[in-house]
From Swiss-Prot:
Signal peptide: none annotated. Its main location: cytoplasm. GO terms for biological process: histidyl-tRNA aminoacylation. It comes from the Bacteria. The lineage of its organism: Bacteria, Bacillati, Bacillota, Bacilli, Lactobacillales. This is Histidine--tRNA ligase. Homodimer. GO terms for cellular component: cytoplasm.
Length: 425
């Protein structure tokens, strides 16, 4: 057997990892402005944590989950999404307690796992950034969270974005619409795809977001959920639209958008980005006021979203957005001869401890090859250290752009390298 990474996974090498780190840091800094704190949950959960919350009939549970029985015969699943584990943690750690300041605002960054056909921007191990806000039923919380996502994408420079918005209403509105949709679709059952015929029995709202051509034709004149919202649900959705307008965040109402998870109610949304003529979902989420009680916690409103890092990187690449990740090295130390080996190590370490980035040669190469390395690292300065420099205690440091040179003592470098850099760079 050839030892390679499993299908649907990837190795993220240093040059690429720098892009990931940049995106993660921008997300962290953005979320911090909104008073969100990071939460880290296990990569695997008890099967029921996901099946109970996401929905037994969803594609995630029926087709896509990586689940197994461990050596203690516990039914375990690798997490396929981030919200359910965070809600489980919220309840288990009693973050609903009165002494905990509300709303509780949490974000996570980590790996998720789904068994599906690998394609660009969608792998079997994928990485997700998500946020969850617990404790506020105020439509302003919906809008703030959507605005935070918009803020993040604006910071990254993403272009041609559209916010798609819909409401699933409260449970009674949703139940009334569910029945209306069943009544509408049942006469044309045989015209639906096999998956949607199953969905019609289990979760008819999912037929609305099917990508199959025959299903799209069938739902073209389907009743709109907005016609089945009760007064409470209408008021909530109208308030969300009004506040988005106040914040100058444009949106379109998309009544066929239902989201793939069963726990949503009231506001749901997706941000779409135009890429090579196609609309790609960049981020999606919504309100889930009943989910905490599914985990035997008290009735607690919630709102959140998730976005895939692979998908985000793909969109940035396709839109020609270059991330500012290339940071030049402060100094490269060229080493000549065995006599300078130990001193070079001490010198480069002293430079690093003063807060500068530094590298040295470890391969005993000729000076020309070492200078090429300095260029490839985009080093600002080069120090050459050989036997004579060790004996005299002095070296030449050169600005690698202007070629200006300075003679400095090794003592100056180890005690006050910042002053040298100020003079030379």
């Amino acid at each position: 057997m050839k030892l390679q990474k499993p299908k649907g996974t990837q190795d993220i090498l240093p040059g690429e990892a720098a892009k990931w780190q940049y995106l993660e840091n921008v997300a962290r800094e953005t979320f911090k402005k909104y008073h969100y704190g990071e939460i880290r949950t296990p990569m695997f959960e008890h099967y029921e944590v996901i099946s109970r919350s996401v929905g037994d009939t969803t594609d995630i549970v029926t087709k896509e989950m990586y689940d197994f029985h461990d050596k203690g015969d516990r039914h375990i699943t690798l997490r396929p999404e981030g919200t359910a584990p965070v809600v489980r943690s919220f309840v288990e750690n009693k973050l609903f307690a009165p002494e905990v300041q509300k709303p509780v605002k949490l974000y996570y960054i980590g790996s998720m796992f789904r068994y599906e056909r690998p394609q660009a921007g969608r792998l079997r191990e994928f990485h997700q950034i998500g946020v969850e806000c617990f404790g506020s039923a105020n439509p302003a919380s919906d809008v703030e969270t959507i605005a935070m996502a918009s803020h993040l994408f604006e910071t990254l420079g993403i272009k041609d974005m559209t916010l798609h918005l819909n409401s699933l209403g409260n449970p009674s509105s949703r139940a009334a619409y569910r029945q209306a949709l069943i009544d509408y679709l049942t006469p044309m059952r045989e015209q639906l795809s096999k998956d949607s015929q199953r969905r019609l029995d289990e979760n008819p709202l999912r037929v609305l977001d099917s990508k199959e051509v025959e299903d799209k034709v069938a739902v073209e004149n389907a009743p709109s959920i907005l016609d089945y919202l009760d007064e409470e649900s209408k008021a909530h959705f109208e308030a969300v639209q009004e506040m988005l307008t106040t914040l100058n965040i444009p949106f379109v109402i998309d009544t066929n958008m239902v989201r793939g998870l069963d726990y949503y109610n009231h506001t749901i949304f997706e941000f779409m980005a135009k890429v090579e003529g196609s609309d790609l979902t960049i981020c999606a989420g919504g309100r889930y006021d009943g989910l905490v009680s599914y985990f035997d916690g008290p009735e607690t409103p919630g709102f959140g979203f998730g976005l895939g890092l692979e998908r985000l990187l793909l969109i940035l690449e396709k839109q020609g957005i270059t991330l500012p990740i290339e940071e030049p090295m402060d100094v490269y130390l060229a080493v000549l001869g065995e006599a300078a080996n130990s001193k070079a190590l001490a010198l480069v370490q002293a430079i690093r401890k003063q807060g500068f980035t530094a590298e040295r040669d470890y391969l005993g190469r000729k000076i020309k090859a070492q200078f090429k390395s300095a260029d490839s690292f985009n080093a600002k300065t080069i120090i050459t250290l050989g036997e004579s420099e060790v004996e005299t205690g002095k070296v030449i440091i050169k600005n690698n752009q202007t070629r200006e040179e300075m003679e400095v003592s090794l003592e100056e470098i180890t005690s006050n390298f910042a002053t040298i850099m100020e003079k030379l760079v």
